Amino acid sequence: MNDRASVAATLENSPFFMPFSMNRQFKKHPRLLARAEGMYYYTPEGRKILDGTAGLWCVNAGHCRKKIVDAVARGVATLDFAPPFQMGHPLAFEFAERIAPLLPKGITRMFFTNSGSESVDTALKLALAYHRVRGEGHRMRLIGREKGYHGVNFGGTAVGGIVGNRKIFGALVTGVDHIRHTHDLAKNAFSRGQPKHGAELAEDLERLCQLHDPSTIAAMIVEPVACSAGVFVPPLGYLQKLREICDRHGILLIFDEVINAWGRLGKPFAADYFGVIPDLITTAKGITNGTVPMGAVFMKEDLYQAFMTGPENSIEMPHGYTYSAHPVACAAGLGTMDVYEEEGLLTRVGELAQYWEDAAHSLRDCPNVIDIRNLGLIAAIELAPRSGAIGARGMDAHLKAFEKTVGTAKDRHDEDVPGYG
């Protein structure tokens, strides 16, 4: 019995229920990662695996960076926990001050969470509460997009548009609608960067405004580049149209930048890259380079100030988490910002994007490739699905890549799209 077979036998009855995984398949054919360094993972047998997806779109600066590791070690040895409610610790305020200059113009305040899913649900609650404190409590409707991914909590799943993530859970949150996605193989296949066709799809939001009465809509949430569902790059002018419609009707625009942020497009935030400033931005992942769970919601100054109008002895936002602004996470975040700044990683993508684009599109003539999409250092290769076995070809590609020592990300929807980020 070889080592991997021995591991499989050990894992067969493991109590661990793995997330977003085919548990039975994995336990028969385990793919374990024992350590990491730089761009590579290492298996227990010592095989070197290229991390083609930056962990789960989060290890933007590479694995086990000494400056970040040292910051975490100092942090946990100094202050392992501090209550975030009615108390605080210096690193939370220091980290907020460190991030603030990187935010898009007009975005000034931040609320710390522990994950992208928490960031999304926090942003949705902030949007609803904002309208209520301004006397517009009738604005309760939330708008998402088909094929959108906004985490796995109830709010994020409800506004998300990936069928496989939604159907098992029933009705979820009420008062949610979706506009169409922008994926169009007929018009935009093999586009380099932003596709030319599809900006008019933003008008779906205007139609929903007319259907429901815009005064009932609280917020629209969208990923600037929809990554988890297969890398759908926004058509030219699309995000600008969404911003215009939201402004016209007093609807808050939320950018889910859990993946897009922290330099993946060559700017700290996708909002800067596209020149469209939302009202709220969600983030996580790269905020600590994936070392310690953390997320945040960034917001415009007027949103923050709307909550500051009540009595000073009142809690302005009855929301938060035990681990919000955790001191060790803040230490990791500060170490991460040091690495980003010292190595110019938030803007370096601009130097590499053309090389990455050419490399991705060089695979155009490979068997079964029906589309390649890219922007910045994000790309996806869409494969023709097998008849009667949607998703199988993409999973096979994922497994074979691992055997060839390359890590890939199988998308979370029902097409064959191995993604790279």
Language model feature labels by segment:
Residues 1-421:
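Conserved N-terminal phosphate-binding loop of PLP-dependent enzymes in the Aspartate aminotransferase
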